[in-house]
Amino acid sequence: MSIVKDMSLAPSGLQKIQWVRDFMPALSGIEERFRKEKPFAGLTIAVSVHLEAKTANLGLVLREGGADVHLTGCNPLSTQDDVAAAMAHLGVDTYGVHGVTPQEYEDLLVETLKCRPHLIVDDGGDLISLLGGRCADLGERLIGGCEETTTGIHRLIARE
């Protein structure tokens, strides 16, 4: 189940995602390989990134690889509501709303982690930080993850 601002925004988001797929083909070769090999079959991936068309495409590629993808924004001010609605429309569990409060943002992250992911793709370290604290009970299946930013790495090192 997704939490997005307004599902009626999906057509605009679908257009943006299609533009990325048409004019930014870097992931298309990987997607073709994933479609055949299904390297993530049986795995659940929680993805926290700037929720816009390019990163939405990454979520779709991971899904083609067999993953059960759960997508959220890593910054409530960068989340594009139409793209979030489009991903929900496409069947990807999406938790993202532009302009939410800090508490609402954390609640969306928690909703994302309720999938009990095997893998995490994080930008800023918010998902991984929650698994090390408030949501420790949701990380029992976790086998790996990646953090995009130096800031996120520093946050995680500080938790040691």
Kindly give the residue locations of the regions a language model identified.
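N-terminal ligand-binding/catalytic initiation module
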Residues: 1-160
